[in-house]
Amino acid sequence: SDLWVLCTLPQDDEMFMPPEGNDPLSATDLFMLRRWIEEGADWPESAKLSPKKKNFTELGVLPKDLYRELGFSEGKVKDEFSGYRQEIITSKLNFEMLPIKGGQFTMGSPLDDPNRGKNEFPAHPVKVSDFWMGKHEVTWDEYELWMLNLDKDNREYNKIEESDGDGLADAVTKPTSPYVDMSFGMGKSGHPAICMTQLSAKMYCMWLSARTGKFYRLPTEAEWEYACKAGTDTAYSFGNDSKELSNYSWHVRNSRFQYQKIGQKSPNPFGLYDMHGNVWEWVLDQYAPPAKEKPKQ
């Protein structure tokens, strides 16, 4: 039911229901609503719902406003399409971005792949444009600059005069401070950041854009798979022999049931590390069943 979906969205979602000016439904109300829907009751035509207005002051700067202030616009890459190392100002941290030349590839897995997931077929052609991808997974060192507001604390401690970019970066919404250590004792320095929502991952990219003046976003599912396959058509970017997997990834049989520091295994042909293991990554778009028509862009 669309009504159920709208009433159970995050409260800061612009489509969130109930009607404007009313409090969210209680757990009891939601239970009754679900029972009502399951019993096949029709929604009265006279009843109208309108989404609750967002409080932009509380929610922080919007993506479109942030990117407009930064002067970003859609279009082809104007600068040289090459790898670079990005420094995060006010910290001693930096990360590498690698250029991924676009092209067409087969997204998904063939039916004869014994390790394929049930949602990985039918395999279908997809085209992707040029893009950049981080050489490594985002580390806690990088992520906590935003999540714990360490970037702002560093500027204040070192009495660094605030710039326009600082103000925009500070306006990006931050998550609620965690109640427990989200590394669960597995280590933080040099380790990949985990346990964030997709929204938090998007907000981090917004903050990183404001902090650096370069446009950052999550990769699409197609871009991620294209980068993972790295121009190959085998089960793994290194071939079909799963016995070689431990040379390229951390997985359940060699990781001692915990994540490991980034970049310790061999990279794939595109120079990207930990694409076959260690931790999962968020992508920009949502899952949709594969289409069978002509290659998608």
Spans of model-derived segments:
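Aromatic- and Gly/Pro-enriched helix-to-coil junctions and flexible linker segments
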Residues: 1-83
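Active-site microenvironments of metalloenzymes and redox enzymes
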Residues: 37-41, 107-115, 127-239, 247, ...
